[in-house]
Amino acid sequence: MMQRDDLTFRYAHKEEAALLHEYDSRIFGDSWSEKSYLGSIFSSTELVPVAADTETGEIAAFAAVSYVLDEANINRIAVIPEFRGRGIGTSLLEWIEENIPDEVTEINLEVRESNKYAIEMYKNFGYTVLGRRKKFYRNPEEDALLMTKRKVDR
């Protein structure tokens, strides 16, 4: 069970959609809108988990996950720059896997080919490279590696 004294893991609140959009804009070249985050927060087939600093309540990392039947896709996962280097992304991914609906047996994600740290983290969690999506990312343009984990360990 994922536990850290310095972080609280929970789902995003509707009041945080604008802040998530702001963080998203700082981190990704192709950011999601506030409306997109609101839609995900209220969706019955999407999750928007966050890792918040236990003392301050400040969001340290966030993700956006969608699922249909037995398959999930991690659409976003990011650590706020000032919180990087503390294993927070790893902890959030572990929390996601522990809290994803029981019927999910496969998780997919795309990752920038240049994001070696994230690729290594995913491999350590048992994800494998399934393929490549040419020119998937913009700003800057880059290929994505499609990674998958066939069975979520419970």
Language-model features: where?
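Conserved catalytic-core motifs of GNAT/GCN5-like acyltransferases
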Residues: 108-110, 123, 128-145
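Conserved GNAT acetyl-CoA-binding A-motif
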Residues: 93, 99-110
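Acetyl-CoA-dependent GNAT
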Residues: 2-4, 11-82, 93-99, 150-154
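Glycine-centered loop/turn positions within well-structured domains
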Residues: 72, 86, 145
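Short acidic/glycine-enriched loop/turn segments that link adjacent beta-strands
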Residues: 45, 70, 115, 137-143
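Conserved glycine-rich acetyl-CoA-binding loop
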Residues: 77-94, 112-120, 124-125
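Short acidic/polar active-site loop segments enriched in Thr and Asp
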Residues: 70, 105, 128
